[in-house]
Design a protein with these regions (language model features):
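Secretory targeting and sorting signals
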Residues: 1-12
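Primarily mature extracellular domains of secreted and cell-surface proteins
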Residues: 13-194
Length: 194
């Protein structure tokens, strides 16, 4: 008995991404720093083998610090996440339809017989412009020493119903609030196709 085995889907090697760092001084004198380091993106074949779905596993560490300000920090938020860009949104799905028919004829007096067969069909989808979504992975507030560290290790990212390329990029968002000012800023990793 002979069988046909499909070759396994190609698998990419994990990619180490460049570290990112951004320092800033707020209007009320806080020295702020955020960074992303140790980022690895492992793009893998889609588990369902769907042609319009992409998957990856991500690892990254982000840290934030705040020091030297004149007004105490009343509230803070630090987020590590990913942005995912889908080239074309095909979530409306496919519509398949058609018609078919058979027609016959008989001619007299020559006793001729004839017939015809016809079919028409279509496949239709609604292509919408690409979309970009935020995928916050984890968050926390600064501790009493003005520090926060966030880590994700081998977390799953997936995109379904995407026609064309799917790209992701990491981000770290940092916000502090004092009586004198509210400061928000972010850094972004390099985009990578998954």
């Amino acid at each position: 008995m002979m069988g046909v085995n499909a070759a396994p889907a190609a698998r990419s090697d994990p990619v180490s991404m460049a570290p990112q760092l951004y320092n800033k001084v707020s209007d009320d004198g806080w020295h702020l720093s955020i960074q992303i380091r140790g980022e690895v993106v492992n793009s893998v074949p889609n588990l369902a083998a769907a042609a319009n779905s992409r998957e990856a596993f991500v690892t990254a560490t982000a840290s934030a610090t705040a020091s030297g300000g004149s007004s105490p920090i009343q509230e803070s938020l630090f987020i590590l996440g990913y942005q995912l860009g889908c080239q074309s949104d095909v979530s409306a799905g496919l519509v398949v339809g058609g018609t078919a028919g058979i027609a016959g004829s008989v001619g007299l007096p020559s006793a001729s017989v004839g017939g015809s067969v016809g079919a028409a069909g279509y496949v239709q989808t609604i292509l919408q412009p690409g979309v970009i979504v935020d995928l916050p992975m984890t968050n926390m507030a600064l501790n009493s020493a003005g520090r926060a560290t966030l880590s994700v290790d081998n977390l799953h990212i997936k995109a379904d119903a995407c026609g064309g390329d799917v790209n992701i990029r990491s981000y770290a968002y940092f916000r502090i609030s004092t009586e004198a000012a509210h400061t928000s800023y972010a850094i972004y990793g390099d985009p990578i196709k998954i």
